[in-house]
From Swiss-Prot:
This is Gibberellin 3-beta-dioxygenase 2. GO terms for biological process: gibberellin biosynthetic process; gibberellin metabolic process; response to light stimulus. The gene is GA3OX2. It comes from Oryza sativa subsp. japonica. SUPFAM superfamilies: Clavaminate synthase-like. It catalyses: gibberellin A20 + 2-oxoglutarate + O2 = gibberellin A1 + succinate + CO2. Residues 203-304 form the Fe2OG dioxygenase domain. Fe cation binds at residues 227, 229, 285. Pathway: Plant hormone biosynthesis; gibberellin biosynthesis. Its cofactor is L-ascorbate; Fe(2+). 2-oxoglutarate binds at residues 212, 295, 297. Its EC number is 1.14.11.15. Keywords: Dioxygenase, Iron, Metal-binding, Oxidoreductase.
Amino acid sequence: MPTPSHLKNPLCFDFRAARRVPETHAWPGLDDHPVVDGGGGGGEDAVPVVDVGAGDAAARVARAAEQWGAFLLVGHGVPAALLSRVEERVARVFSLPASEKMRAVRGPGEPCGYGSPPISSFFSKLMWSEGYTFSPSSLRSELRRLWPKSGDDYLLFCDVMEEFHKEMRRLADELLRLFLRALGLTGEEVAGVEAERRIGERMTATVHLNWYPRCPEPRRALGLIAHTDSGFFTFVLQSLVPGLQLFRRGPDRWVAVPAVAGAFVVNVGDLFHILTNGRFHSVYHRAVVNRDRDRVSLGYFLGPPPDAEVAPLPEAVPAGRSPAYRAVTWPEYMAVRKKAFATGGSALKMVSTDAAAAADEHDDVAAAADVHA
């Protein structure tokens, strides 16, 4: 019997034609933990909201990063009309014929291009999604792979994404200042100025586009496996179709992030967890799919350049204590993370200097990773 095409190349799988979820895409254990609503109401599972311009923004960032590792960001000043155009262009990319998208397929070890989620290579099951990754610094050359003859789609996409990148770098710098203020480092102090300069001036950006097609059996499939982001922090722009979920303990549950028009979801990443000595913790999250509507999202990832060592800021280490984590570069940490995926361990534990001092959340969410098998 010939091998099904989606086993030879998962990108050949036709989500639109699927009437059932094949075993290649079926994940066990998706209902092991309840899902609760993270919308308003002020309950303990209401996802924190931070208004960038509010007087207590730094305090709210601190509380959210310490207790959740994520929050909804509003009042950020990125025009709503621009966000609508971004979402429209993202949807357009994934509406292209498969033969055109395959022109830009991401090869083994390549950071940019079209393909399955980058973390999919660590798992035996396939995810109900497609993605496209690019660096804003090489946007126009990268997208020529998708649109080799240029044309209106190419020009519109590049123009919109360049405008979006400019706004997001401004916002990233603003949020970095809030994070540092939340740690007690202000721009009026030498330490605060130096930290902002050292981190902000070399911070790099990567954009990942996601498409989660409607699914005939959404309780058997997963758009994106439970994971933490590896970098500093991520802005997630999601459409008004919900699907992002955050993992919380006590009791174990998934919190469904509400789809709020014009808001970004901010996720703390592992390297920021290290930079803050574990005070601001990275968050396990996943993307689920639904039966009726496609969903698109965009992740704007911030992190250090590959040659920069990331270690706990002195101001984040309690007096009389040693740093909880050793210094690592991003590539070094990704190698550790690959080993952690293979063994079911915690990458943060692997780079900790003292397991007790590290006290990271990742052991607590081990149950959330049961679907890795």
